[in-house]
Amino acid sequence: MLKMESTQQMASSIINSSFEAAVVAATSTLELMGIQYDYNEVYTRVKSKFDFVMDDSGVENNLMGKAATIDQALNGKFSSSIRNRNWMTDSKTVARLDEDVNKLRLLLSSKGIDQKMRVLNACFSVKRVPGKSSSVIKCTRLMKEKIERGEVEVDDTFIEERMEIDTIDWKSRYDQLERRFESLKQRVNEKYNNWVIKARKVNENMNSLQNVISQQQAHINELQIYNNKLERDLQSKIGSVISSIEWYLRSMELSDDIKSDIEQQLNSIDLINPVNAFDDFESILRNLISDYDRIFIMFKGLLQQSNYTYTYE
């Protein structure tokens, strides 16, 4: 069965509309007083105060609870409405409500809202006439009951006094609003133009930075290509040097063991990584110099044993 929650939705809509009306009333009052304000700050402060008052006073929960009771009755569940009826007719409830009313009267009096203002506000309401500046004063049910009970009297000592009505210069009001509008329009245009200029500068800087990045990337690509070519040339040169040394080694009158040892050292050279290849060359040269040094020491010892001397030329 479809549940009806139209009353709760209407109550929630009324509460939300009341909040929006409070925000509009606050901002319009500040504008009429010529006070500059931040809309977001006003909205946040009114929202915080409104939520606190509605929650702390229990008004929102009371309204939503009554709306839920009505929706339950519309859905065929009358137990909650019967409990509310019994609660409203209980003597303790009446006494408690009477006590709350007295507290509210004392609170209103302490705030400067006297009995005359409270009674007049309870007896009359003002209805605006659509499309006109005039309004209609309506009597409430309390006023009707007071008339029926004879609690309304006409003051014979009332003296009609002339009311001084200030003539509103609508043209000056319009001109003032127009000047304010033009001033606000100019400020908005200035801010917008400044924003456009800043956005253009940011866009130009971004384009310039993008061009620099593109140039740097192209330069990096060129260096990478050159580095790859240089690496291939070094690999080719190292390979040709090894081949040349091997060919030269085969033409020498050295023993096969020595040739084999040198060829093994040459074959161990890294042809892929030039840095490692230079390290291998350094190792081979160190070994050759070390072998030459040992041969020279042996030759020097033989000369000394044979009582020969040697000189460098």
UniProtKB/Swiss-Prot annotation:
InterPro entries xref list: NSP3_N_rotavirus, NSP3_sf, Rotavirus_NSP3
Keywords (A to Z) from UniProt: Coiled coil, Host cytoplasm, Host-virus interaction, RNA-binding, Translation regulation
Location of the region described as RNA-binding in the Swiss-Prot/TrEMBL record: 1-149
BP-aspect Gene Ontology terms: regulation of translation
Protein's cellular compartments: Host cytoplasm
Annotated region (Interaction with host EIF4G1), positions in chain: 208-313
Region of interest: Interaction with host ZC3H7B: 170-234
Gene Ontology terms, MF aspect: RNA binding
Any one GO cellular component localisation term in the record: host cell cytoplasm
Major place of residence: host cell
Recorded family membership: Belongs to the rotavirus NSP3 family.
Protein name: Non-structural protein 3
Organism: Rotavirus A (strain RVA/Human/Japan/S2/1980/G2P1B[4]) (RV-A)
